[in-house]
Curated annotation (Swiss-Prot):
Low complexity compositional bias, start-end: 220-251, 270-281
Keywords: Glycoprotein, Repeat, Secreted, Signal
Signal peptide: 1-21
Ranges of compositional bias, category Acidic residues: 330-339, 374-384
CC annotations in GO: extracellular region; spore wall
Protein name: Follistatin-like domain-containing protein DDB_G0289517
UniProt keyword annotation of Secreted present: yes
Biased composition (Polar residues): 254-269, 301-321, 386-395
Repeat found in the keyword field: yes
Region named Disordered: 181-400
Basic and acidic residues composition-biased segments: 192-203, 352-364
Subcellular localization: Secreted
Chain ranges of the Follistatin-like domain: 399-421, 471-494, 596-618, 660-682, 687-710
Length: 712
């Protein structure tokens, strides 16, 4: 007996270690390990604005975040209406930190966090999905990561106020009270399999419904006959009769068809007994459900109390799934035994035939299956019977009950954590697809400030790619401008100084270079001086894929490779414009120029600007003389009003002498604008090379004003 007890303890200890070893903490896995465990973990690429990009291993199966998303986009009917894959981007913000998740799943948020969808344009030109509202909020972070829409947007879609609490709508409990009781007792603290009920259980729904009433009646019947049945069982065990298997355990095992386990409870009030029994029964049933090995009988006939220390949260998912699949037949057999005396007699006859076989042979020859528990062993002594009934299932909280997800998404529980998942791709018309990011080089991990609640993450961090440098070959200056490239500053354009001719000392004019326009005698000595213009790009032929630049300060004309906007990595605060000669060039983004009489260009000698809810260009009449019936009808800028000398026309003659910018001289660095209230001087502040006009307007370079917005 002692040897058997020692063997049992060793096997149980090994089982405990094996169950613990199968626990996987996705948050602590590296990239390769996270990919290998994709049935439990999901590798998500996370982009931050002012930090390095990194990979995060989320504790949720990849099939919830990848397969379902791919299946939706594989539908040809939806594919025609669905936006690009970037519509699955979530922007998570807390205080000054912003992260982008390019997945349909996001971690659970705390009260200080918010998630939103970025828009490239303002709400006037953007559209949000149902359950979201658009808010104009402009953000252009200086330390933004390239091509990260969460760091650079004009507006955002945020959850609207009419968000209702989501009670995990995707969860579907197994049909039938029997299957539900089995699930509740085998998985008291783990709701992650509720969303995928077993298909075999659904096939047996009709049988479960058929026995639903029998379970309730039998539970009441068994509670009344507990004392008598227990005495019969004890008598059978002590006598060791050949028909010992005929007397079945009177405990109703509608939720537990495994090998009976020793109970150790005290007879107390029913409410207190249920609470204590629920906790202990949960731990014992977990051990049986999660065990990949058969449960050995208790050979020493003593209750084993050391198993209660096992944490119920560390059970194996596969074992509980197998147990749920294989229990229905056994449950139906146990229920049939209690339906009537006729069924009991039939069961006893079958058991009598089986009991004739020697127990030792059966014990040594038949090896129990991993997914099946061995038959009842009469050597186990049940000291007291539990008062718990199948209808009293353990109470466990659903994380989705406290979670709030916006319309268009639903709550998903995995690993005792709540996630908000999109039901279908949202209808975003403003999102632009992101280019595929190349695999960056690995660098030593820096400390990142993560803002997730109860998260301990080991991040596989990667360095961001080097940002492109601005040069005079990637920006465009006008023909009369020169590009200045100083150390520590971005290149800029300024007015080109007058060209200086190039002189050559030659012995005669015939030796002057081609293109020389002047040949004069040398006043200092013999020979001549040949004068020619500096060499320019018109005299240089570049090879294919290059272009020539000759307006770089202190740099001779040179060929540079063309810039392709679709393949280039655009610097922050810049956008790329295609060009036939240069291939493309960068233009700096700045705030939209506010339209006013100061920034609006009104072309024409008699044009002037009127501030009337917005600048408007109007034109004065060409005539400076108007005929009016009386002097009070003359314009405000009338200098004189005289009677009409023409006898044919009655009235007065209004002589107009308008003050205009033609007679106004503004201070230095200022320019004059004709308005309806007279000429005004404004400070020169606009440069078309680094400014943008609003839509339907173009920035026109002007020598006096520097630049102004002209309506298209």
């Amino acid at each position: 007996m002692k040897i058997q007890t020692i063997i049992q303890i060793v096997l149980i200890s090994f089982l405990f270690l094996n169950v613990e070893s199968k626990k996987i903490n996705c948050l602590h896995l590296q990239q390769d390990e996270c990919i290998k465990n994709k049935d439990k973990c999901f590798l998500s690429n996370v982009n931050s604005c002012c930090e390095k990009d990194f990979l995060m291993c989320l504790p949720i199966s990849s099939k919830y975040c990848e397969s379902q998303t791919d299946d939706v986009f594989s539908n040809k009917n939806i594919l025609k209406k669905s936006p690009p894959s970037s519509s699955h981007e979530w922007c998570l913000k807390k205080k000054k930190s912003i992260l982008r998740f390019n997945t349909s799943c996001v971690p659970e948020l705390d009260l200080d966090s918010e998630y939103f969808k970025p828009n490239l344009y303002k709400c006037k030109y953007s559209k949000c999905q149902k359950g979201f509202k658009c808010v104009d909020e402009k953000l252009h972070k200086k330390c933004e990561t390239e091509n990260n829409p969460c760091c650079k947007y004009e507006s955002k879609c945020v959850p609207s106020k009419d968000i209702d609490q989501n009670e995990a709508p995707i969860f579907k409990n197994p049909k039938g009270q029997l299957a539900q009781d089995i699930y509740n007792h085998l998985n008291p603290d783990s709701p992650q399999f509720k969303d995928k009920p077993n298909h075999e259980n659904h096939k047996k729904d009709k049988n479960n419904k058929k026995h639903k009433k029998d379970i309730k009646n039998n539970s009441d019947k068994n509670n009344n006959n507990n004392n008598n049945n227990n005495n019969k069982k004890n008598k059978t065990i002590n006598n060791n009769e050949p028909n010992q298997n005929q007397q079945s355990n009177p405990i109703d095992r509608t939720f537990n068809n495994e090998t009976p386990f020793p109970w150790n409870f005290k007879n107390q009030d029913q409410q207190q007994q249920k609470q204590e029994q629920t906790q202990k029964q949960t731990q014992k049933e977990y051990f049986k459900a999660g065990s990949p090995y058969p449960v050995l009988p208790n050979l020493n006939k003593e209750p084993t109390t050391h198993l209660n220390t096992i944490e119920p949260t560390s059970f194996t998912a596969s074992a509980s799934r197998y147990q749920l699949e294989g229990n229905d037949n056994k449950d139906e057999e146990n229920i049939d035994e209690n339906n009537g005396e006729d069924k009991k007699k039939k069961k006893k006859k079958k058991k009598d035939d089986k009991s004739k076989k020697p127990k030792d042979d059966e014990k040594h020859t038949k090896k129990p299956n991993v997914t099946e528990q061995p038959a009842d062993d009469p050597s186990i002594e049940i000291t007291e019977e539990p008062t718990i009934t199948p209808s009293s299932s353990p109470v466990h909280q659903d994380p989705c009950k406290k979670a709030t997800c916006p319309n268009g998404s639903h709550c998903l529980v995995y690993g005792n954590q709540a996630y908000c998942k999109l039901d279908k791709p949202p209808n975003y018309q403003t999102m632009s697809p992101l280019p595929q990011k190349q695999q960056p080089s690995v660098k030593k991990m820096d400390s990142l400030s993560m803002f997730y609640k109860k998260s301990k993450m080991l991040l596989s961090e990667y360095t961001t790619e080097q940002r492109p440098q601005l040069t005079c070959s990637t920006i465009k200056c006008e023909d009369d401008e020169v590009c200045i490239n100083k150390v520590g500053l971005n290149p800029y354009c300024q007015i080109k100084p007058p060209p200086k001719p190039v002189s050559y000392n030659k012995t005669s004019c015939s030796q002057c270079p081609i293109g020389s326009y002047r040949c004069n005698p040398n006043p200092n000595g013999s020979g001549v001086i040949c004068e020619t213009d500096a060499i320019n790009c018109r005299l240089i032929a570049c090879k294919e894929g290059e272009f020539c630049i000759d307006n770089i300060e202190n740099t001779p004309p040179k060929c540079y490779p063309k810039l392709l906007c679709n393949l280039s990595k655009i610097p922050p605060d810049y956008y790329c414009i295609s060009d036939e000669i240069r291939g493309g060039f960068y233009v700096k983004y700045e705030s939209y120029i506010d339209l006013s009489c100061e920034t609006l260009l009104c072309e024409g000698v008699n044009s002037y600007c009127v501030e009337n809810g917005g600048p408007i260009c109007k034109t004065w009449p060409n005539d400076t003389i108007q005929y009016q019936p009386s002097c009070d009808k003359c314009p405000k800028d009338t200098m004189s009003c005289t009677p009409n000398e023409n006898s044919n026309n009655k009235g007065v003659v209004c002589r107009i002498d308008r003050p205009s910018c033609s007679v106004i001289q503004c201070p230095d660095n200022q320019y004059c604008v004709n308005t309806d209230k007279g000429p005004k001087c404004y400070k020169r502040s606009i440069e078309c090379s680094n400014s943008r006009c609003p839509r339907d307007y173009t920035c026109k370079r002007d020598e006096i004003r520097g630049g102004a917005c002209l309506k298209n």
